[in-house]
Regions:
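Short coil/turn segments that connect the beta-strands within blades of beta-propeller domains
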Residues: 39-40, 80-82, 127-129, 184-186, ...
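A short beta-strand motif characteristic of beta-propeller blades
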Residues: 60-66, 103-112, 161-169, 204-209, ...
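Blade-loop segments of beta-propeller domains
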Residues: 65-95, 99-123
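Short, conserved, GDST-rich strand-edge loop motifs in beta-rich repeat architectures
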Residues: 133-149, 236-251
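Blade-level signature of beta-propeller repeat domains, shared across WD40, Kelch, NHL, RCC1
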Residues: 338-372
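An edge-strand/N-cap motif at the start of beta-rich repeat modules
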Residues: 34-63
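Short glycine/acidic-enriched loop and turn motifs that connect beta-strands
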Residues: 91-93, 137-142, 195-196, 244-249, ...
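Repeated scaffold domains used in trafficking and secretory/extracellular systems
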Residues: 70-77, 115-124, 173-180, 215-232, ...
Length: 372
């Protein structure tokens, strides 16, 4: 199935056309076409003043990057993989690490005096000259705390100064917001109730996509996937699981969707009843993997993105907090997070292979594939 915004011609129209696109998933590309090699390095935040660098090929920690503050709670990598952004545990300070030299090139905070400013979310412009930041401040007064309204800022990464305040669309303050830039940096996409495209220079609204509307007549509300993957098939295109309500049967469904931000197009295909499964894309874009986690019961899932189906699922000895990542060469699956171990499984059979034990507990992980 496919759905475009009003005024655009859908790639495929109507529910009855679902079978016609079963083997035409947008964005399925080979590993070589994505520019990724067959190895990757993991940058791991932990409770020390270091970021660990773990190499998939050797399964060893190959470097340690000193950082100024302990407990790197969140790590992000720039689109060109040349910068690592390290967030402190108080959501107040960001340190910038140059890759591959692994040297700190600066840090900044918006907190000052009795005012603490929390950085709730941010996105760096492709030029790496500035970032959009969603922040909120708290000021300690003599008899109380004053909590300011959430604000979106334009922050200059050369001067470390706020250079503009980005107005809220419709002058309506939101309690949460996430961002993406278009590949050319001309548009700033804001994810709120709607998907709003702003001119990245003037911050004027240039387009809007009501992503809460049903994609087809008779279908219920559908939550679209916008999660980023180290093996994202192309800029501005996101593949993942969606969930929707079937109003006729009064049930929740789950399926696979590919979303094109620039074209405002969606290709989707329901695959069965909704279950609480995560999703991550394979390096070649033809498969997806997920985890189902319930108290005392854990499953690994595999999705065939060409035939739009569940290709396999197996119960295994998981952990209450965990994440899954495929290896860059596509032969292994890693179970990690919330601890100091990485469990390695065979991608084809789900067979457990071995456990790698680190000397630190992970707080955040970002995977950076080597260039192809």
């Amino acid at each position: 199935m496919a759905r475009s915004r009003p005024g655009r011609t859908p790639k495929v129209a109507g529910i009855a056309a679902a079978a016609a696109i079963a083997c035409a998933l947008s964005g399925v590309r080979t590993l070589e076409a994505q520019g990724n090699g067959r190895n990757a390095h993991w940058y791991m935040g932990n409770y020390s003043n270091e970021v660990l660098v773990w190499d998939e090929a050797t399964e060893k920690v190959v470097d340690r990057i000193p950082v100024k503050r302990p407990i790197s709670l969140r790590l992000d990598v720039s689109e060109d993989r040349s910068r690592l952004y390290v967030m402190d545990p108080f959501f107040e300070t960001i340190e910038i690490i140059a890759l591959p030299s692994k040297e700190s090139i600066g840090e900044f905070t918006l907190s000052e005096g009795s005012t603490r400013t929390w950085i709730r979310s941010f996105q760096v412009h492709p030029s790496q000259e500035w970032m959009a930041m969603f922040v909120q401040s708290r000021t300690k007064l003599a008899d109380r705390y004053r909590i300011d309204e959430p604000t979106i800022l334009r922050f200059d990464l050369a001067t470390y100064e706020v250079t503009d305040t980005i107005p809220w669309p419709d002058e309506e303050t939101r309690r949460s917001a996430n961002f993406r830039f278009s590949p050319d940096g001309d548009l700033l996409y804001m994810f709120t109730d709607d998907l709003i495209a702003l001119d990245s220079e003037t911050f004027e609204e240039v387009d809007r996509w009501d992503i809460t509307e049903p994609l087809e007549p008779g279908l219920g509300e559908m939550r679209l996937p916008f999660g980023q993957s180290p093996y994202q098939e192309e800029d501005g295109v996101y593949t993942g699981l969606f969930r929707m309500t079937d109003p006729l049967q009064n049930r929740r469904l789950m399926g696979i969707a590919t979303v094109d931000l620039a074209g405002q197009d969606v290709e989707f295909h329901p695959i069965g009843p909704s279950e609480g499964v995560s999703f991550v894309l394979s390096p070649d874009g033809t498969k997806g993997y997920g985890l189902k986690s319930e108290i005392g019961h854990y499953e690994m899932w595999k999705f065939d993105l060409l035939d739009r189906r569940v290709a396999g699922r197996i119960a295994f000895a998981g952990r209450p907090r965990m994440a899954l990542m495929p290896s860059a060469d596509g032969t292994k699956l890693y179970i990690y997070n919330a601890g100091s171990t990485i469990d390695i499984y065979d991608e084809e059979t789900f067979e457990f292979l071995r456990t790698v034990t680190l000397d630190a507990d992970m707080t955040s992980v970002v995977v950076v594939p080597d260039p192809g």
